[in-house]
C-alpha cells in the first residue's frame, strides 16, 4: 500500500515536469507547425517508454485485451486535448489562455464528481479550487494584460475548456477502468498512437517547416519527449493507485503555472517578478498546504 505522502511527492514531480512545457513548446513552434511538432514529440515519447514496459508479445497482448481503454485515452488525453489546446491557445491572449487552461483542476473535479461515485466535491475541495484559480488569475494578469473581446477569442476559450473536459474524462477512465493494464504500457501506447494521429492530421492542414532544422529545435524536441514520457507514466501510475481520487490528485496541477512563471523569470530575458504574480504563487501554495495539512512531511519520502 502506498502512503499518501508518496503519492503527493510523485504528483509534484510530474507537475514540475509539465511546467517546463510552456517555454519549451514556444521554442519548438518557432521552427515547426503545432500538429506536426506535437505528433513527432508524442511518437518519440511513446518509444522512449517501451524499454521500461514488458516483453513485446505481452505488450501487444495487453493492448489487444485492453484496446478500448487505450483507444479512449489516446483519443481524449492526446488527440482531442492537445489538438484543441494548441489551436485554442492561438486564438486567445496568453494570459487568458493560461487562466482557462489553469482551471483544469476545477473541470476535472466536476467531471469526477459526476462520473466517479467515490470522488465527490467537498467544501474543503471547492475552497481549495477557488483559491487555486484565483492564484492562476493573479499569476496570468501579473505577466500579461488580461483581455477578452472578440468572438474568435470565445471560440478559443471553448476549445481549451473542451480539451480540459476531455482530459478529465480520460483521467476518470484511467482511474476506474485501467486496473488490468500496466501503466507504462498505457502511457507508451496512447502517446505513440496519439502522436501518429496528430502527425497524420498535420499533413493535409499544415505546410511543415522548410529547410533543415537547427540543433536547438532537436534538443527542445528531445526534452519535451522525455518530459511527456516521464510525466504521463507517473500520472497514469498514480491514477491507478488504490484510494487515489482523481480530483484530489489534479489539485497539484495548480503548481504548474507557479513553477512555469518561475522558470520564465530565469529563462526569458523580458520576464521579471511582479507583485501580482508573486501573490498568486503564495495563494496557490498556501491553499495546497492547507488542503493537505494532515499529511505528515516525513511521509513524502517514504516508499519511493
PLM ranges: what are they?
Residues 65-72, 121-133, 181-190:
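Cytoplasmic-side transmembrane-helix entry/capping segments in multi-pass membrane proteins
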Residues 3-7, 31-39, 62-68, 141-166, ...:
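Juxtamembrane helix-entry segments on the extracytoplasmic side of multipass membrane proteins
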Residues 28, 37, 41, 88, ...:
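Hydrophobic/aromatic residues within transmembrane alpha-helices
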Residues 40, 96-103, 173-195, 228-266:
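Helix-helix packing/entry segments at the starts of transmembrane helices
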Residues 31-80, 105-111, 166-170, 187-206, ...:
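Transmembrane alpha-helices of multi-pass small-molecule transport proteins
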Residues 17, 21-22, 53-101, 138-139, ...:
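Specific transmembrane alpha-helical segments of multi-pass solute transporters/efflux pumps
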Residues 1-39, 149-176, 184, 196-200, ...:
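Glycine-/small-residue-enriched transmembrane alpha-helix faces in small-molecule transporters
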Residues 49, 71, 111, 123-143, ...:
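Hydrophobic transmembrane alpha-helices of multi-pass small-molecule transport proteins
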